[in-house]
């Protein structure tokens, strides 16, 4: 199963094995670790999301809310690990100028100042230092495999807290020796990427700073350990993802009233649109006892709406929360590709005759568009200005190519017309943009309707040849997301279709039309 946007698209009839207890426990432990630390995050910037209701309805117990949140957390984490090959835990430093960051620095500095004062006192006070070594011992032991081994016994022997307390009573604790042993042990069990940190620790001369840096590196080592676990369990999670995610979501639905409200509304919009369309085409169908809708067609139309979704203002259906960041990124890339295709179409229509036979020029113009349209989905981006710049540079490149061939350059009127038409692409309902939108939607719809046995890509509609390679890559990523979503949530969609259509005789057709595994 390609989970990270490979060229091969996921087919809808892909099977999933049953959930195993080892997998569930592994995901739960990862989720618990992530919640308890609260300092790690995913590099894909995925946010934990909950169903649309912002406050629990009356009668919903707090325990139910927490249970649903736990299931959502486990499900989201498992999904992210499975579909995102780059997923890893990483330290999330507080903003330097934030209140929380300042409070943290002040409190930590106060602790280390007290420790330094205690160790410098006559006689030295070891209470805080002993607590630190006790915590260090537990962290080191957590890196080792369960069961007895020589290193485990050695750590317990050297960092024997009872013995250290006895030594402290006689002011005979070798703090430097204990710290050196800890650093040596860390060097034996850390990942190679931490070797430089270990060398820096060994070069530190101030004992308090050394202890401070030991904890910093131990935190990094714990992060490395969790990422190692994630890499190793990823194939297992991928193998069981469909069944596991479906079962977890079922628990959320059972624990949370109206857990599918946004999903129901999402499907209802497409059903109403299809029914209205059928009535317009064949008014007699209005009196038919059974809707002639294809649930799979309606569902595909729902997925297509996600390509033009307002991710800043509209809430996603609950069944798509885990893929929200991926869908938003895909939609933004597709929007930029559409604008590139629009620019190429207008340019070709206006000056194509004089630039025919210059493929390198077409590639240069495409690169110019890609560079100047970078970041066009940001609110601060000035699209009109970018399109004007593209028009000016396009004219310059075309004139340069014509001069090299000894041909007349574009006159001022043609150049002004070209720049003006390109600048008008930012206007709402621009006919060229509308046309390209329809063709991209047609291409994506064709991808979703591909038989599972077909491995080749559908033909690219006219005008999209300039972005064919990029469109195929995004199309496969989109199809992978959609087909996995159908496998996981097919039974939930079928139940919603039943309720919306109120047709008992249609139930069998609906069940047969939607993938459930």
Swiss-Prot record:
Location of this chain's protein in the cell: Cytoplasm, Cytoskeleton
Keywords from the named record: Cytoplasm, Cytoskeleton, Phosphoprotein
Pfam families in alphabetical order: Tcp11
Keyword Membrane among UniProt keywords: no
Phosphoserine PTM sites in chain numbering: 16
GO biological process: muscle cell migration
Low complexity: compositionally biased ranges: 36-55
Region (Disordered) residue spans: 1-59
Keyword Cytoplasm annotated: yes
InterPro entries, per database record: Tcp11 (IPR008862)
Entry GO terms, CC: cytoplasm; cytoskeleton
Function: Promotes the migration of muscle-derived satellite cells (MDSCs) during differentiation throught interaction with FMNL2 and therefore may participate in microfilament assembly.
Family from the record: Belongs to the TCP11 family.
PANTHER family recorded: T-COMPLEX PROTEIN 11-LIKE PROTEIN 2 (PTHR12832:SF17), TESTIS-SPECIFIC PROTEIN PBS13 T-COMPLEX 11 (PTHR12832)
SUBUNIT field: Interacts with FMNL2; this interaction promotes muscle-derived satellite cell (MDSC) migration and differentiation.
Protein name per its UniProtKB record: T-complex protein 11-like protein 2
Name of the gene: Tcp11l2
